[in-house]
């Protein structure tokens, strides 16, 4: 009789594919585990020392994160810097997820609290507020390149040639028109500077008003959502109470019916006993 050594494992694999897959998974060594399965593992909790180090590293690399779109390498630098500071090794993806979650938590708390009230009781709120408050200085209030203030009276007088001063002025109307033109230029330049100054002063006020209105709208939407959720919960509670009352009423009816049946049984037993005694 001819024996095939590899026939039995092949037949078992064909007849029981689940067992074959389990055996194959068991034979795969640990260093060949895919990164997708690594992501599904539960991440370690962040310690207080790691959080303080993360705040410092985030503040240090904040500008670099904002300047680059594909910032995976920046997160890897942050991970190595955090490892140097705390001795705990974290992946760049973990740091990115943690920063995203903390930013979401910060914005949620900022919308829920008033800007003039006491900050929330979250130990990292002020640190994140300081980090996210970094904005590039605006160039508002500055004159554009190439724009110069209007000519002054002293400059116009200095620009006049000595021959023009020495020659007799037999066209006084033309002279007055030139002087009026210089005065108009000077007044236009001063008025443009004043208007630019007023616009630069009005812009922060408008921004603050728009920001406060935006926050008020967010608060109103949040309060409306909370009110709607409260109404939904109250309706569910009322429905539950009605169901409980209905069940209790049915239970009372069943108890009354059982008592009536017991009384009937007792009366029947008494009649049977009386007849047997006779």
UniProtKB/Swiss-Prot annotation:
Q: Which domain of life is it from?
A: Eukaryota
Report the InterPro entries cross-referenced here: Myb/SANT-like_DNA-bd_dom_prot (IPR026095), Myb_DNA-bind_4 (IPR044822)
What is the species listed in this Swiss-Prot or TrEMBL entry?
Mus musculus
Renumbered to this chain, the Polar residues biased-composition regions fall at 149-166
Q: Which residues cross the membrane?
A: none
Q: Where is this region: Disordered?
A: 139-167
Name listed for the protein in its UniProt record:
Myb/SANT-like DNA-binding domain-containing protein 1
Name of the coding gene: Msantd1
A Pfam family annotated for this UniProt entry: Myb_DNA-bind_4
Enumerate the spans annotated as Myb-like domain. 44-131
């Amino acid at each position: 009789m001819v024996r095939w050594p590899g026939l039995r494992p092949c037949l078992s694999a064909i007849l029981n594919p689940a067992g074959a897959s389990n055996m194959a998974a068991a034979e795969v060594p640990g260093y060949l585990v895919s990164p997708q399965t690594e992501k599904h593992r539960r991440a370690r909790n962040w310690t207080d020392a790691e959080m303080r180090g993360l705040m410092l590293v985030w503040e240090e690399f904040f500008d670099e994160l904002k300047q680059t779109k594909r910032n995976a390498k920046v997160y890897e630098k942050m991970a190595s810097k955090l490892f140097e500071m705390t001795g705990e090794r974290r992946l760049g993806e973990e740091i990115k997820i943690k920063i995203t979650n903390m930013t979401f938590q910060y914005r949620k708390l900022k919308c829920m609290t008033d800007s003039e009230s006491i900050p929330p009781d979250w130990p990292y709120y002020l640190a994140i507020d300081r980090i996210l408050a970094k904005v590039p200085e605006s160039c508002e209030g500055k004159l554009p390149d190439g724009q110069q203030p209007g000519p002054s009276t002293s400059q116009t007088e200095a620009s006049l040639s000595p021959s023009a001063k020495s020659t007799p002025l037999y066209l006084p109307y033309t002279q007055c028109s030139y002087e009026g033109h210089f005065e108009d230029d000077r007044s236009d330049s001063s008025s443009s500077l004043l208007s630019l100054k007023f616009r630069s002063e009005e812009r922060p006020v408008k921004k603050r008003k728009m920001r406060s209105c935006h926050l008020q709208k967010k608060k109103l939407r949040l309060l409306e959502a909370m009110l709607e959720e409260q109404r939904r919960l109250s309706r569910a509670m009322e429905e539950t109470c009605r169901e409980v009352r209905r069940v209790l009423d049915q239970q009372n009816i069943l108890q009354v019916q059982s008592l009536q049946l017991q009384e009937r049984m007792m009366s029947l037993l008494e009649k049977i006993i009386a007849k047997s005694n006779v």
